[in-house]
Amino acid sequence: MSAKTEILRNIREALGTRAPDTPIEREYRQAPALTQADRITLFTDRLQDYNATVYRTASVPEAIAEALRARVKRGLLIPPAFPPQWLPAGFDFTRDDGLTYDVIDHSEGALTACTAAIALTGTIILSHSAHEGRRALTLIPDYHLCIVRVDQLADTVPEGIRALAGCRTSPITTISGPSATADIEMIRVKGVHGPRTLDVIILEDVIIWEEP
């Protein structure tokens, strides 16, 4: 028996019978009470702080077309099960059905959905479902256009993590703005660990799809 254990035992014996534990009431607020409008505004502000461009819309095809025209892009790579009704006419979209890394690297970028997003930190979470694509699709290209539905938007990090309850065996990627890093001399470089440019479409109409 260690000296610490013996000392604590002697203290407990000296105190006599231990009183029953008293439960602590947890009536304090554990998360911000945001309205949906406040949540969207906070998420948008955080993304813009990260130099991401945000589009709020009820029409995904129109927002995608607007983003591609603004970036002067002719088309993007998309995950295998990306909803076809979201794709605007007049652009070239290539489904990733096993594209080589070289093809992905030389593409104009990727268009994906997401699993969840966190308003407080401006973070997008990917679990790489068939609507989001494999990790290479959102790490190799220089441009990422991501769609976030309002019903996927959580207030805080714990709430966002709870949205991953069914994704315990999936690889998880968290995105807080375009990729950037700094060395010991604080020289900031973009695009080292992922896309240099991030655009986000916030879909204000809730659309539920089924996993293939």
Each PLM stretch: what is its role?
Residues 1-212:
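The feature marks the mature, well-folded catalytic cores of soluble enzymes
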